[in-house]
Amino acid sequence: MDTISDVMKHCVPINYDDYDPLPADHFSTYPVFCSKATAEAIEASAEFTRKWKRACEVDGLHQDKLSFQACTTHLGHYNQWAYPDCVPERVSLNAVLSDCAFFWDGMSPVTGRSANVMITSPVDVSDSISAEKMNELTQDFGIAMLSELQSGRRIEPKFEINKMAVQVIRDFIAVDPFTGIGHLKEWKGHLDAQKKSTHNNMSWEKYVEHRVNESGGNWGISVGCWTNDIRISDEEKESVKYLTQLACAGGILGNDYYSFPKEFDEHHRSGTLDRIQNGVALLMREYGYTEEEAKEIIKKEVIIREKKWMDGFNAWSRQAGPETGEIRRYLVMTMALMSGSMFWMSHAGRYHRTDLATTAEDRATLIGKSRGALRVLEGYPPPKNLEGIVREPLASAVQDDNGHVQHEDAVADSSVRNGVHDAFKKSNPRNGKQNGTEGSKGTFTNGGYVQPAKLQQHCTSINSMAIYTAPFQEAAGDICDAPYGYIDSLPSKKNRNKLLDLLNDWLQVPPSSLKRIKNIVHMLHNSSLMLDDIEDASALRRGQPATHTFYGISQTINSANYIYVHVVDEVTRLYNPECINIFVDELRNLHRGQSLDLYWRHHARCPSMEEYIVMVDNKTGGLFRLMLRLLTAESSISRPFDTALSRLLTLTGRYYQIRDDYLNLASADYESKKGFCEDFDEGKFSLPLIHLLSHTRYPDRITSALFNRKPGTNLPYEMKRYILAEMEEVQTLAYSQDVLKYLHEELMHALDEAENRLGANDGVRMMLLGMGPKLLLC
């Protein structure tokens, strides 16, 4: 069995005697390796830094502290430890890529984004720029890079730093297109994941899970595949994902350990302390630990994961055959990335600044600043100083009308998690006081349902007859809100809100109307998902249990319908009275589209492609049309409904649905969130299934397997594999890819037409380019 050192070809184990002084704060237990080509990396970084400074001057950007953000330290270069086994001919370009990523991140304004080991690390506020300027830079870079990648159309960026960054990516892909494209896919996935959630009011376990999913770990690993020239399939990566995720978790928590003072300082200066996303901060805020206690916990958690990784790797090695050599290199590279990053962070100026404006006393103000009662961290003693701290009580469990267990704390906390809906409730004068306050309504608390004070006056004894003649009392909304609050708390990319903002660049809707339209679309979308999951018998939604698995079918339906009432109320508050007619019109279309889907499934009737498109335009396209029509109705500029924009949104709805159909069968990430080929379990007539039934020699076999099952049972795994094999034989997935490529080209043509009529919209262009099939299908 090869040892870890045997796998390394271009590096040697670190000699701690070579480092003076030795980093005092280094605690990782992983072995650390050092590249034999350190000088080349340092030289390449120095030259790139000089060019970047000149480009910043040309662009008028304030970047006078690059020395704190660069990869080079007084002991060496980040890459010599993080990517020690980089093949010699790629060392210089890899050094440039790392510096480019750090410098770019250094300009980002502090808005609550994550700080990551491999790509986005803490930055100095004095070097950051405004959100508006950063948005302009990002769009300039994104359009140039994605246009070239998706369509081969080369567009030179306007900013000098973007010209440098785009050239780095071009060189990166040119050296190795296979791993280069894979790297870009992971980079985009990392950026998408960062948009999904913040970490306020989150448990430690959930925090670690979220950080692994949203951090730059997979991005850094994909760079490692490029640096080390590792050729590994997605299936092989998936087979050892449990080990790479374990390594990433340790590295991410290590980053939290080293970066906390820096991150706190950034957020304190920018007034965003409520959005700091760091494990030390979470343990202080949600669990009441001091900074020292929290850092000790983080350190233990890192070491635990490192030991588990080493044990897991050794166990895997004992049973791995000679054909797994590339997987072994992949795993060792991942471990080296984490160990090298930890060594670098233990002494890099980026994490050990002496010019912070805040102190340990300032950071201590986070202790106990949770939104509710403090949590208890399993496996660790409570904070030493518990004076004045209220521990979170254990939630009592109740059963709903369908016998499903639900926790009362989930109900009581729903308004905390539900940002959009909670904002609506606060602005609605028809709603009474909530969550334990006395008013005309009852409340649902950890002690159970509490009667309103007025009603209690009529019920002085259990045998009182007064309750039968008491005045009307409006019931509390907590129980009705709870299922919606749950689905609204799940991670989401918020793409519809983003699209609304981008369309508004054309339509110029007043801020108050735009906010209401966002609420309308958001609530309508989530309520439709609650109903869809019931109608499709889906067990998962966004990688978490579907709403009805917690709250039961009856309560979930009631909550979804209750949200429709809220949506109608919001629509009536828009300025243009025509908005209610628009809403009714598109809601009618949405339900008609859904009825087609359900009808075909119930009667096992395969629709034609033309019928499928009609269903998509009504069901999926309904929300897109609703967005556009409401924006147009509320627009502050006199402009008729634009047909070019309407076509753009129609094609966008089709692309979303067909992409979803394809990913359901072909994406490992989708499988983790919804299950393996879930559309087969639902009996859904997706585009791939319609194509298969139109081309296979044995359509009856497929329909018999799909529709002659015991209700409520999933299609057996072997049958799913059979259907996928049949799709392979008739090239169904290849056809789906061709449709997506064609549809995306038409989308971009429709955007060109819309821009010719309405003016350029870089935000919409970047968003649509980012959805393109090149990254999706690679």
Curated annotation (Swiss-Prot):
Ligand binding (substrate): D105, N255
EC number(s) recorded for this UniProt protein: 4.2.3.-, 2.5.1.-
Binding of isopentenyl diphosphate, residues: K493, R496, H525, R542
Residue sites binding Mg(2+) 3 per the record: D532, D536
MF terms (GO), sorted A to Z: geranylgeranyl diphosphate synthase activity; lyase activity; metal ion binding
Pathway: Secondary metabolite biosynthesis; terpenoid biosynthesis
Disruption phenotype: Abolishes the production of the ophiobolin family sesterterpenoid.
Pfam families: polyprenyl_synt, Terpene_syn_C_2
Positions of Mg(2+) 4 binding: D532, D536
Annotated region (Disordered), positions in chain: 423-445
Keyword flag Metal-binding: yes
InterPro entries: Isoprenoid_synthase_dom_sf, Polyprenyl_synt, Polyprenyl_synt_CS
Residues that, per the record, bind Mg(2+) 1: D105
Region (Geranylfarneyl diphosphate synthase): 360-774
Alphabetized UniProt keyword annotations: Isoprene biosynthesis, Lyase, Magnesium, Metal-binding, Multifunctional enzyme, Transferase
GO biological process, one term: terpenoid biosynthetic process
Catalysis: reaction(s): 4 isopentenyl diphosphate + dimethylallyl diphosphate = (2E,6E,10E,14E)-geranylfarnesyl diphosphate + 4 diphosphate; (2E,6E,10E,14E)-geranylfarnesyl diphosphate + H2O = preaspterpenacid acid I + diphosphate
Composition-biased stretches (Polar residues): 429-445
Gene3D superfamilies: Farnesyl Diphosphate Synthase
Region (Sesterterpenoid synthase): 4-359
Region spans: Substrate: 211-214, 259-263, 350-351
Superkingdom of this protein's organism: Eukaryota
Residues annotated as binding dimethylallyl diphosphate: R541, K619, T620, Q657, N664, K674
Function of the protein: Sesterterpenoid synthase; part of the gene cluster that mediates the biosynthesis of aspterpenacids. Performs both prenyl transferase and terpene cyclase activity, converting isopentenyl diphosphate and dimethylallyl diphosphate into geranylfarnesyl diphosphate (GFPP) and then converting GFPP into preaspterpenacid I. C22-oxidative modification of preaspterpenacid I by the cytochrome P450 monooxygenase sttB then leads to preaspterpenacid II. It has still to be determined how preaspterpenacid II is further modified to produce aspterpenacids.
Family annotation (PANTHER family): GERANYLGERANYL PYROPHOSPHATE SYNTHASE
Record-given protein name: Preaspterpenacid I synthase sttA
Gene from which this protein is expressed: sttA
